Amino acid sequence: MTNIRKTHPLAKIVNNSFIDLPAPSNISAWWNFGSLLGVCLILQILTGLFLAMHYTSDTATAFSSVTHICRDVNYGWIIRYMHANGASMFFICLFLHVGRGLYYGSYVFMETWNIGIVLLFATMATAFMGYVLPWGQMSFWGATVITNLLSAIPYIGTDLVEWIWGGFSVDKATLTRFFAFHFILPFIIAALAMVHLLFLHETGSNNPSGITSDSDKIPFHPYYTIKDILGALLLLLILMSLVLFSPDLLGDPDNYTPANPLNTPPHIKPEWYFLFAYAILRSIPNKLGGVLALVFSILILAFIPLLHTSKQRSMMFRPLSQCLFWLLVADLLTLTWIGGQPVEHPFIIIGQVASILYFTILLILMPTVSVIENNLLKW
């Protein structure tokens, strides 16, 4: 008799995705982040569900309801901090996952890569709306500043902003709809993640060498299941260390002050994972230009496969491209630092240089250096 996992319509899908899936024998720990993102998403949906049971999306009671969760609900404090810091872990895994894709040329799988970009945008939108929900000072002013950017769109901008707000300012209607969207989006992300996997399994995984691994495959289970479980345990160890020892390390103290439309905080800034994009936005003196740069700072990823001029897929054997890649990482860290600094000398000029360098590396230097490497190898 054939095993049920190979015949049952549902079990068969699970079997072909997580058990009998042929996987390259040499994929490193950098390939763990996909499963870690899945763990993060499940964790966020579960903690978010329990938070939603006690949260009220009304301007008069939102802040108090979060306080109530932390003080009065059984283990509410740990659920709240796991959700808040879980978002940080989510973005750390996201950035490392995208970085891995850039380094090893995973973007050659166009469909998988493009769905990944959509996933990145959806996750950023979800995180932004979630940050508004506690209705602290930074929640309110962050929502005001970021939604206001849409007013830079010619002709329809102002109407669009007021339509999103549900009025003439960020208010009760805005908070209610943000809660609704924040609740539904993670399920859309989960569906997109399945499509992401579907496209990946059409081609099979890439590997560090960038060379086809069809001649050397191993079953996903037990080799990569145990590896993924180890990764998940390490992720939980880091997350719980953060939650239990310094839960407010990555948060903004301003968000412990209830939202006040009459009092603007001295430095409005988003959560740390958006600071690099925020720095690029602020580097351009023109509003529309800044918004376009902000969008393209992420959308530029869609152009990476088109700019791949190297005859090798991975950067594993391309030392010049490796240097540029790590320069890009350093540049993004610089932008993250600048995004959290006030708009004054010398931070303005550092931000502008770092922003120009970011686009220059991706659009000009990397394709050029790839051609040079091809010629050095007499290809």
From Swiss-Prot:
Gene Ontology MF term list: metal ion binding; ubiquinol-cytochrome-c reductase activity
Residues involved in heme b b566 binding: 97, 196
Keywords associated with the record: Electron transport, Heme, Iron, Membrane, Metal-binding, Mitochondrion, Mitochondrion inner membrane, Respiratory chain, Transmembrane, Transmembrane helix, Transport, Ubiquinone
Cofactor stoichiometry and binding remark: Binds 2 heme b groups non-covalently.
CDD domains hit by this protein: cytochrome_b_C, Cytochrome_b_N
Domain of life assignment: Eukaryota
Membrane topology: Multi-pass membrane protein
Disulfide bonds: none
Bilayer-crossing regions: 33-53, 77-98, 113-133, 178-198, 226-246, 288-308, 320-340, 347-367
Annotated positions binding heme b b562: 83, 182
SUPFAM superfamilies (UniProt xref): a domain/subunit of cytochrome bc1 complex (Ubiquinol-cytochrome c reductase) (SSF81648), Transmembrane di-heme cytochromes (SSF81342)
Main location: mitochondrion
Required cofactor(s): heme b
Biological processes annotated in GO: mitochondrial electron transport, ubiquinol to cytochrome c
Compartment(s) of residence: Mitochondrion inner membrane
Miscellaneous comment text of the record: Heme 1 (or BL or b562) is low-potential and absorbs at about 562 nm, and heme 2 (or BH or b566) is high-potential and absorbs at about 566 nm.
Job description of the protein: Component of the ubiquinol-cytochrome c reductase complex (complex III or cytochrome b-c1 complex) that is part of the mitochondrial respiratory chain. The b-c1 complex mediates electron transfer from ubiquinol to cytochrome c. Contributes to the generation of a proton gradient across the mitochondrial membrane that is then used for ATP synthesis.
Protein's UniProt name: Cytochrome b
Organism (species): Canis lupus
Lineage: Eukaryota, Metazoa, Chordata, Craniata, Vertebrata
